[in-house]
């Protein structure tokens, strides 16, 4: 296994270009399954483990792809399978994104239930509700979702989401573009990732109204085509890099980053005392002498994102006072807190709220990653901790951050990847 070894205490400053968004890449890659001819060319696709896993899934279905210099080419002309097997789906919950496209194109899809909990804190029931509303019959047996469209064709419908769901909204969009008639989605997710998926589907020939809002209207079509498309930047990676500069007292400029997609996060950095300067495609952060404590509540977009919650907790350990971080999306997403406290943080957990007492002087030590954003949080802590911090199990980090140690070194961090044996 790999670990990151960090010598803390160095201010990080410099200029970086933001990577393409992983959370946008996955649904637009899935959407290529909707069309069976031509070649898709997708620019600004990050070279990540999750992208590789998704490509393996497409290859299993019969697609061909290549990724070079962040440009992904995909041909789905030879897709001849409707089966997404457990061996691939278990690696990544986002594999559920193939359900809608396969069902819409072939009238039948058989997709393994994602690994972990099928109906727990991150349920798939909304995805199944969407397909049933569009006229599919759903059965679950032997660990697989078996979805069959009546008479081989989905039908447009009105779908109201009881709670906002990016994944279910994405699957609804992809299924609806090939359905007969009109589909309306209310209380749909409005995240930039959904906006970008809409723009990709429109480029393919779909008709979608209300893009960027929580009410979407999709006119079904039978004619889509392959396209060349530019992916958007990764707003969570960008927020993490801004936090890396802020927690170490440095300054950073991110290029090819749209501040419109980060209003809630940039507002909180400003409240913490950081100076924020933006252009239409860049963000600059200058750190204050002392960070101020700032409460945040993670909720669906346009509110503060749950995927920045862990990083904000790390940042607030260095703020002069007490802050409260509440997560209303995933109530138990606090696995990083015991590890932060091992480094000297003072954090209490009360239900879905973390109370962070700053300023705390962190001391380096070994810490264990438990998930993607927890890994980023621990790296941030290591950057400011005194001495050496070892972040173990960084395969979690590799799922969502492209060349993270190289980028941090560019800013002045002392960080290197080493192999270790886990017993």
UniProtKB/Swiss-Prot annotation:
Recorded GO molecular functions are: UDP-N-acetylglucosamine 1-carboxyvinyltransferase activity
Uppermost EC category? transferase
Residues bound to phosphoenolpyruvate? 22-23
Q: Where does UDP-N-acetyl-alpha-D-glucosamine bind?
A: 93, 122-126, 307, 329
Q: Which reaction does it catalyse?
A: phosphoenolpyruvate + UDP-N-acetyl-alpha-D-glucosamine = UDP-N-acetyl-3-O-(1-carboxyvinyl)-alpha-D-glucosamine + phosphate
Concerning NCBIfam families, the annotation shows: murA, PRK09369.1
Family stated for the protein in its record: Belongs to the EPSP synthase family. MurA subfamily.
Give the protein's recorded name. Answer: UDP-N-acetylglucosamine 1-carboxyvinyltransferase
Gene source species: Chlorobium chlorochromatii (strain CaD3)
The gene coding this protein: murA
